[in-house]
Amino acid sequence: MSSIPAPAATIVMEACGSAHYWGREFQQLGHQVVLLPPQRVRPYVRGNKTDRTDATGMLEAYRNAEIRPVPVKSVAQQTLAALHRLRSGWLAQRTAQLNSVRGLLREFGIVIPVGAPHVVPRVRALLEDADSGIPDALRNTLADVCTDLRTLEGRITQVERQLEALAQQLPTVARLRSIPGVGLLTATALVAVVGDARRFPSGRHFASYVGLTPREYSSGATRRLGRISKRGDAYLRMLLIHGARTTLWHAKHRKEPDSLRSWAVRVEKLRGHNKAAVALANKVARIVWAVWTRENTFTAIAHAA
Protein backbone atom coordinates (compact mmCIF):
# COMPACT_ATOMS: atom_id res chain seq x y z
CA MET A 1 0.00 0.00 0.00
CA SER A 2 2.94 2.33 0.50
CA SER A 3 3.56 2.14 -3.28
CA ILE A 4 0.25 3.90 -4.01
CA PRO A 5 1.09 7.45 -5.21
CA ALA A 6 1.12 10.00 -2.39
CA PRO A 7 -1.19 12.47 -4.18
CA ALA A 8 -4.81 11.38 -4.00
CA ALA A 9 -5.44 8.75 -6.68
CA THR A 10 -8.57 7.11 -8.03
CA ILE A 11 -8.43 3.36 -7.43
CA VAL A 12 -10.84 1.22 -9.46
CA MET A 13 -11.60 -2.31 -8.27
CA GLU A 14 -14.21 -4.98 -8.78
CA ALA A 15 -16.63 -5.35 -5.85
CA CYS A 16 -15.48 -8.89 -5.09
CA GLY A 17 -14.24 -10.65 -1.97
CA SER A 18 -12.35 -8.37 0.49
CA ALA A 19 -12.86 -5.36 -1.84
CA HIS A 20 -14.68 -3.40 0.85
CA TYR A 21 -11.86 -3.95 3.33
CA TRP A 22 -9.25 -2.72 0.87
CA GLY A 23 -11.53 0.11 -0.15
CA ARG A 24 -11.63 1.35 3.45
CA GLU A 25 -7.85 1.01 3.74
CA PHE A 26 -7.27 3.08 0.59
CA GLN A 27 -9.80 5.70 1.69
CA GLN A 28 -7.93 6.12 4.96
CA LEU A 29 -4.85 6.97 2.89
CA GLY A 30 -6.79 9.73 1.15
CA HIS A 31 -7.53 7.97 -2.14
CA GLN A 32 -10.84 7.82 -3.99
CA VAL A 33 -12.10 4.24 -4.31
CA VAL A 34 -14.49 3.12 -7.04
CA LEU A 35 -15.94 -0.39 -6.72
CA LEU A 36 -17.60 -1.69 -9.89
CA PRO A 37 -20.11 -4.58 -10.05
CA PRO A 38 -18.25 -7.59 -11.53
CA GLN A 39 -21.20 -8.51 -13.78
CA ARG A 40 -20.98 -5.05 -15.40
CA VAL A 41 -17.22 -5.25 -15.88
CA ARG A 42 -17.19 -8.68 -17.52
CA PRO A 43 -18.52 -7.53 -20.94
CA TYR A 44 -15.59 -5.12 -21.22
CA VAL A 45 -12.93 -7.81 -20.74
CA ARG A 46 -11.80 -9.04 -24.16
CA GLY A 47 -9.49 -11.88 -25.13
CA ASN A 48 -7.72 -14.09 -22.64
CA LYS A 49 -8.07 -13.40 -18.94
CA THR A 50 -4.91 -11.66 -17.80
CA ASP A 51 -4.19 -8.90 -15.32
CA ARG A 52 -3.73 -6.53 -18.26
CA THR A 53 -7.08 -7.32 -19.90
CA ASP A 54 -8.85 -7.21 -16.52
CA ALA A 55 -7.40 -3.77 -15.79
CA THR A 56 -8.28 -2.50 -19.27
CA GLY A 57 -11.83 -3.81 -18.93
CA MET A 58 -12.26 -2.14 -15.54
CA LEU A 59 -11.03 1.19 -16.89
CA GLU A 60 -13.45 1.02 -19.83
CA ALA A 61 -16.31 0.17 -17.48
CA TYR A 62 -15.28 3.02 -15.18
CA ARG A 63 -15.58 5.48 -18.09
CA ASN A 64 -19.16 4.36 -18.73
CA ALA A 65 -21.30 6.82 -16.79
CA GLU A 66 -24.27 4.42 -16.83
CA ILE A 67 -22.50 1.93 -14.56
CA ARG A 68 -23.17 2.84 -10.94
CA PRO A 69 -20.29 2.17 -8.54
CA VAL A 70 -20.87 0.08 -5.42
CA PRO A 71 -20.44 2.15 -2.23
CA VAL A 72 -17.68 0.96 0.08
CA LYS A 73 -19.30 -0.72 3.08
CA SER A 74 -18.40 0.27 6.61
CA VAL A 75 -17.29 -2.21 9.26
CA ALA A 76 -20.73 -1.92 10.89
CA GLN A 77 -22.46 -2.79 7.61
CA GLN A 78 -20.26 -5.82 7.04
CA THR A 79 -20.81 -6.97 10.62
CA LEU A 80 -24.58 -6.87 10.16
CA ALA A 81 -24.28 -8.64 6.81
CA ALA A 82 -22.09 -11.37 8.34
CA LEU A 83 -24.62 -12.00 11.13
CA HIS A 84 -27.44 -12.25 8.59
CA ARG A 85 -25.40 -14.67 6.48
CA LEU A 86 -24.64 -16.88 9.47
CA ARG A 87 -28.29 -16.89 10.52
CA SER A 88 -29.42 -17.82 6.99
CA GLY A 89 -26.92 -20.67 6.86
CA TRP A 90 -28.04 -22.10 10.19
CA LEU A 91 -31.69 -21.76 9.20
CA ALA A 92 -30.97 -23.74 6.03
CA GLN A 93 -29.17 -26.44 8.03
CA ARG A 94 -32.04 -26.67 10.52
CA THR A 95 -34.64 -26.93 7.76
CA ALA A 96 -32.65 -29.64 5.99
CA GLN A 97 -32.28 -31.70 9.18
CA LEU A 98 -35.95 -31.27 10.12
CA ASN A 99 -37.07 -32.46 6.70
CA SER A 100 -34.60 -35.34 6.82
CA VAL A 101 -35.88 -36.54 10.21
CA ARG A 102 -39.52 -36.30 9.16
CA GLY A 103 -38.75 -38.19 5.94
CA LEU A 104 -36.80 -40.95 7.69
CA LEU A 105 -39.50 -41.56 10.29
CA ARG A 106 -42.20 -41.61 7.63
CA GLU A 107 -40.46 -44.71 6.20
CA PHE A 108 -41.33 -46.46 9.47
CA GLY A 109 -44.94 -45.28 9.46
CA ILE A 110 -44.35 -42.42 11.90
CA VAL A 111 -45.75 -39.06 10.78
CA ILE A 112 -44.41 -35.92 12.46
CA PRO A 113 -46.64 -32.82 12.19
CA VAL A 114 -45.40 -30.03 9.94
CA GLY A 115 -43.66 -27.18 11.72
CA ALA A 116 -40.27 -26.80 13.40
CA PRO A 117 -41.61 -26.60 17.00
CA HIS A 118 -43.22 -30.06 16.71
CA VAL A 119 -40.26 -32.12 15.53
CA VAL A 120 -37.77 -32.30 18.43
CA PRO A 121 -40.33 -32.79 21.25
CA ARG A 122 -42.18 -35.40 19.21
CA VAL A 123 -39.02 -37.32 18.26
CA ARG A 124 -37.75 -37.31 21.84
CA ALA A 125 -41.08 -38.63 23.07
CA LEU A 126 -40.89 -41.41 20.48
CA LEU A 127 -37.32 -42.25 21.53
CA GLU A 128 -38.47 -42.67 25.13
CA ASP A 129 -41.16 -45.10 23.99
CA ALA A 130 -39.69 -48.56 23.47
CA ASP A 131 -42.69 -49.57 21.34
CA SER A 132 -42.70 -46.52 19.06
CA GLY A 133 -41.48 -48.50 16.06
CA ILE A 134 -38.11 -46.76 15.72
CA PRO A 135 -35.32 -49.33 15.14
CA ASP A 136 -32.83 -49.55 18.00
CA ALA A 137 -29.93 -48.89 15.61
CA LEU A 138 -31.42 -45.47 14.79
CA ARG A 139 -32.25 -44.28 18.29
CA ASN A 140 -28.85 -42.91 19.32
CA THR A 141 -28.36 -41.19 15.97
CA LEU A 142 -31.79 -39.55 16.12
CA ALA A 143 -31.03 -38.38 19.66
CA ASP A 144 -27.84 -36.76 18.35
CA VAL A 145 -29.83 -35.07 15.56
CA CYS A 146 -32.24 -33.65 18.14
CA THR A 147 -29.27 -32.26 20.07
CA ASP A 148 -27.88 -30.72 16.87
CA LEU A 149 -31.25 -29.11 16.13
CA ARG A 150 -31.39 -27.56 19.59
CA THR A 151 -27.83 -26.29 19.11
CA LEU A 152 -28.77 -24.68 15.79
CA GLU A 153 -31.84 -23.08 17.36
CA GLY A 154 -29.65 -21.67 20.13
CA ARG A 155 -27.22 -20.21 17.60
CA ILE A 156 -30.05 -18.61 15.62
CA THR A 157 -31.47 -17.08 18.80
CA GLN A 158 -28.04 -15.78 19.79
CA VAL A 159 -27.52 -14.12 16.40
CA GLU A 160 -30.92 -12.44 16.66
CA ARG A 161 -29.94 -11.12 20.10
CA GLN A 162 -26.72 -9.75 18.64
CA LEU A 163 -28.66 -8.06 15.85
CA GLU A 164 -31.01 -6.55 18.43
CA ALA A 165 -28.06 -5.24 20.45
CA LEU A 166 -26.49 -3.66 17.36
CA ALA A 167 -29.85 -2.23 16.32
CA GLN A 168 -30.04 -0.32 19.62
CA GLN A 169 -26.95 1.62 18.51
CA LEU A 170 -28.41 2.59 15.11
CA PRO A 171 -31.15 5.26 15.13
CA THR A 172 -31.93 4.48 11.48
CA VAL A 173 -32.99 0.95 12.41
CA ALA A 174 -35.44 2.24 15.03
CA ARG A 175 -37.03 4.58 12.48
CA LEU A 176 -37.28 1.87 9.84
CA ARG A 177 -38.97 -0.49 12.32
CA SER A 178 -41.85 1.97 12.61
CA ILE A 179 -42.89 1.00 9.06
CA PRO A 180 -45.51 -1.78 8.70
CA GLY A 181 -43.84 -5.00 7.58
CA VAL A 182 -40.33 -3.91 8.58
CA GLY A 183 -39.00 -5.68 11.65
CA LEU A 184 -35.57 -6.29 13.14
CA LEU A 185 -34.28 -8.52 10.34
CA THR A 186 -35.49 -6.32 7.48
CA ALA A 187 -34.32 -3.08 9.09
CA THR A 188 -30.82 -4.35 9.86
CA ALA A 189 -30.55 -5.97 6.42
CA LEU A 190 -31.49 -2.64 4.82
CA VAL A 191 -28.70 -0.88 6.70
CA ALA A 192 -26.23 -3.66 5.85
CA VAL A 193 -27.02 -3.68 2.12
CA VAL A 194 -27.93 -0.07 1.36
CA GLY A 195 -25.78 1.89 3.78
CA ASP A 196 -27.37 5.27 3.06
CA ALA A 197 -30.61 5.67 1.10
CA ARG A 198 -29.83 9.32 0.37
CA ARG A 199 -27.76 8.21 -2.62
CA PHE A 200 -31.05 7.46 -4.40
CA PRO A 201 -32.91 10.48 -5.86
CA SER A 202 -36.38 9.08 -5.14
CA GLY A 203 -38.30 6.22 -3.60
CA ARG A 204 -38.97 4.87 -7.08
CA HIS A 205 -35.24 4.58 -7.76
CA PHE A 206 -34.80 2.81 -4.42
CA ALA A 207 -37.59 0.30 -5.18
CA SER A 208 -35.94 -0.34 -8.56
CA TYR A 209 -32.59 -0.94 -6.84
CA VAL A 210 -34.21 -3.64 -4.68
CA GLY A 211 -35.74 -5.25 -7.79
CA LEU A 212 -39.40 -4.60 -6.94
CA THR A 213 -40.32 -2.62 -10.05
CA PRO A 214 -41.60 -4.25 -13.27
CA ARG A 215 -39.42 -4.86 -16.28
CA GLU A 216 -40.25 -2.67 -19.24
CA TYR A 217 -40.49 -3.89 -22.83
CA SER A 218 -40.77 -0.95 -25.23
CA SER A 219 -40.61 -0.70 -29.01
CA GLY A 220 -41.89 2.33 -30.86
CA ALA A 221 -45.35 3.18 -29.60
CA THR A 222 -45.66 -0.16 -27.78
CA ARG A 223 -44.92 -0.21 -24.07
CA ARG A 224 -45.49 -3.24 -21.88
CA LEU A 225 -44.64 -3.79 -18.23
CA GLY A 226 -43.76 -7.34 -17.20
CA ARG A 227 -42.80 -9.10 -13.99
CA ILE A 228 -40.60 -7.48 -11.37
CA SER A 229 -36.96 -7.17 -12.40
CA LYS A 230 -35.55 -9.06 -9.36
CA ARG A 231 -32.40 -6.97 -9.60
CA GLY A 232 -30.34 -6.22 -6.55
CA ASP A 233 -30.04 -8.18 -3.33
CA ALA A 234 -32.31 -11.24 -3.38
CA TYR A 235 -32.17 -11.69 0.40
CA LEU A 236 -33.30 -8.12 1.06
CA ARG A 237 -36.09 -8.43 -1.50
CA MET A 238 -37.25 -11.67 0.12
CA LEU A 239 -37.44 -10.01 3.55
CA LEU A 240 -39.45 -7.09 2.18
CA ILE A 241 -41.92 -9.42 0.44
CA HIS A 242 -42.29 -11.66 3.51
CA GLY A 243 -42.91 -8.59 5.63
CA ALA A 244 -45.53 -7.42 3.14
CA ARG A 245 -47.26 -10.82 3.31
CA THR A 246 -47.44 -10.55 7.10
CA THR A 247 -48.83 -7.02 6.91
CA LEU A 248 -51.43 -8.14 4.39
CA TRP A 249 -52.48 -11.05 6.60
CA HIS A 250 -52.88 -8.77 9.62
CA ALA A 251 -54.88 -6.30 7.55
CA LYS A 252 -57.35 -9.03 6.58
CA HIS A 253 -57.63 -10.93 9.85
CA ARG A 254 -57.01 -8.38 12.57
CA LYS A 255 -58.76 -5.41 11.00
CA GLU A 256 -56.02 -2.79 11.31
CA PRO A 257 -57.50 0.10 9.32
CA ASP A 258 -55.15 2.60 7.74
CA SER A 259 -54.70 3.80 4.19
CA LEU A 260 -51.71 1.54 3.42
CA ARG A 261 -53.29 -1.69 4.63
CA SER A 262 -56.68 -0.84 3.13
CA TRP A 263 -55.01 -0.23 -0.22
CA ALA A 264 -53.21 -3.60 -0.03
CA VAL A 265 -56.47 -5.43 0.72
CA ARG A 266 -58.15 -3.78 -2.28
CA VAL A 267 -55.27 -4.81 -4.55
CA GLU A 268 -55.52 -8.39 -3.29
CA LYS A 269 -59.21 -8.55 -4.18
CA LEU A 270 -58.45 -7.32 -7.70
CA ARG A 271 -55.15 -9.08 -8.51
CA GLY A 272 -54.66 -11.92 -6.01
CA HIS A 273 -52.54 -12.44 -2.91
CA ASN A 274 -49.07 -12.77 -4.46
CA LYS A 275 -49.32 -9.68 -6.66
CA ALA A 276 -50.76 -7.71 -3.76
CA ALA A 277 -47.85 -8.75 -1.52
CA VAL A 278 -45.27 -7.70 -4.11
CA ALA A 279 -47.10 -4.42 -4.77
CA LEU A 280 -47.15 -3.74 -1.04
CA ALA A 281 -43.43 -4.57 -0.79
CA ASN A 282 -42.81 -2.04 -3.58
CA LYS A 283 -44.74 0.61 -1.67
CA VAL A 284 -42.96 -0.27 1.58
CA ALA A 285 -39.60 0.15 -0.19
CA ARG A 286 -40.63 3.66 -1.22
CA ILE A 287 -41.72 4.41 2.34
CA VAL A 288 -38.36 3.12 3.57
CA TRP A 289 -36.63 5.68 1.35
CA ALA A 290 -38.87 8.49 2.66
CA VAL A 291 -38.37 7.55 6.33
CA TRP A 292 -34.63 7.13 5.86
CA THR A 293 -33.98 10.36 3.95
CA ARG A 294 -36.28 12.53 6.09
CA GLU A 295 -34.94 11.00 9.31
CA ASN A 296 -38.40 10.62 10.76
CA THR A 297 -40.72 7.78 11.75
CA PHE A 298 -43.43 6.35 9.51
CA THR A 299 -46.19 7.62 11.81
CA ALA A 300 -44.89 11.19 11.72
CA ILE A 301 -44.55 11.17 7.93
CA ALA A 302 -48.01 9.65 7.47
CA HIS A 303 -49.56 12.34 9.66
CA ALA A 304 -47.66 15.08 7.84
CA ALA A 305 -48.94 13.76 4.50
What is each PLM-predicted segment?
Residues K73-A76, G109, P113-P117, R139-C146, ...:
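Conserved phosphate/pyrophosphate-binding and hydrolysis machinery centered on Walker-type P-loop NTPases
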Residues M1-D131, P214, L248:
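Phosphate- and other anionic-substrate recognition elements at nucleic-acid/protein interfaces
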Residues H84-R175, K255, T297:
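Glycine-rich, often acidic, oxyanion-interacting loops/wings at catalytic, nucleic-acid
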Residues A61-Y62, L80, L142, L190, ...:
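Short alpha-helical scaffolding segments that buttress acidic/His motifs in well-ordered protein cores
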Residues Y44, R175-L184, A189-H273:
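Phosphate-backbone recognition surface of nucleic-acid-processing proteins
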Residues A221, K252, S259-A305:
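Low-complexity, acidic/Ser/Thr- and charged residue-rich accessory regions of DNA metabolism proteins
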Residues A65-R68, Q97-L98, I156-V159, G195-R199, ...:
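Short helix-capping/linker segments at secondary-structure and domain boundaries
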